[in-house]
Amino acid sequence: MLTKKSIFLAILFTLSMIMVACSSQEYTTAKLALQQSDWAKASEWLPKAMAVEPNNPEIPIVLGVEIYAKDSQWANMVNMFETAMGINPEKVIEVRGPFISVKDAVSNYTEFYWAQEFNIGVEQFKKIQEGPDNKPDYLETAIFHFINA
């Protein structure tokens, strides 16, 4: 038979584990905003979550991918990736489903967005032959995307 003391200790242990494993209210609010595609609210709460959880490398990755990359703010995205790498590159995090290390997430997203920008630049460059009248505009846009890549 379990004594009251052992039941109390088991409940106390369970509650303490739940509290340690939970994200902050700020990060939970930001994740909920992302699920609802409320980008303005997410961009408001993710920096707050970073302030409350400065040792959580998942938050800067999410901020970089879901807010900065979405808005083509590449310098800010890279800054967030560097922040996450500085916290703990080996920590396993969950971003958009799979659990991977911070260093793998940074590598994957950097490569993905580089390829995306490069391909947009190639498409703009190809348009020069299709519409020579707009050659300067297409060339300028292509150069812009190649620089971003």
Predicted segments, located by residue:
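Structural motif corresponding to the intra-repeat A-B loop/turn of tetratricopeptide repeats
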Residues: 36, 63, 68-72, 127, ...
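Short coil turns that delineate tetratricopeptide repeat
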Residues: 54-55, 89
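Canonical positions in the second alpha-helix
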Residues: 49, 83-84, 149
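TPR-repeat structural position
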Residues: 39-40, 73-74, 132, 136-139
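Bacterial N-terminal signal peptides
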Residues: 10-18
